[in-house]
């Protein structure tokens, strides 16, 4: 079982990276629906952040079963803090809006990957960084609902795809 957990820990960042390259800013129908739902509905953003946190808990469980150290406890505390939607929304939207903060998060994740006992922190920073890329920008979220309701579905999708960066 430990070998399986080690394989999951090793493969998980590559799966996230492949998802990023295969799905970000693509015009597939399911991605158009995803972008529209994330922009228009708060519950979709809540569900997205909850799914990210559940994946992080699973990866931290894998880290805890293979290497038990204090970094796992620190990463679990960071994840528990993000279970408040306000905190997770703030973190994801700030990482989306501030490119320097996003770059710093990715640099911290790469540094923690290089240090042997900080692998669980790598997974937290890396996953939250990748998840913030798929989060809608503050510019899109500030558009009033009435303006969205005045447009037809095709115009909404085109505008969201154009401004989803």
Region roles according to the model:
Residues 32-69:
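Membrane-helix boundary elements
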């Amino acid at each position: 079982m430990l070998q399986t957990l080690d394989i999951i820990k090793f493969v998980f960042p590559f799966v996230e990276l492949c998802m990023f390259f295969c799905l970000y800013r693509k015009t597939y129908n399911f991605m158009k629906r995803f972008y529209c739902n994330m922009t228009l509905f708060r519950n979709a953003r809540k569900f997205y952040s909850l799914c990210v946190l559940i994946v992080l808990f699973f990866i931290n469980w894998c880290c805890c079963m293979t290497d038990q150290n204090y970094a796992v406890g620190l990463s679990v505390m960071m994840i528990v803090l993000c279970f408040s939607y306000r905190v997770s929304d703030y973190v994801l939207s700030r990482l989306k809006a501030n490119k320097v903060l996003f770059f710093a998060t990715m640099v911290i994740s790469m540094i923690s990957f290089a240090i042997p006992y900080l692998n669980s922190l790598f997974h937290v920073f890396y996953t939250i960084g990748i998840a913030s890329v798929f989060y809608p920008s503050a510019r899109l979220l500030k558009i009033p609902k009435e303006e969205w309701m005045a447009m037809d579905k095709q115009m909404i999708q085109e505008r969201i795809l154009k401004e989803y960066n």
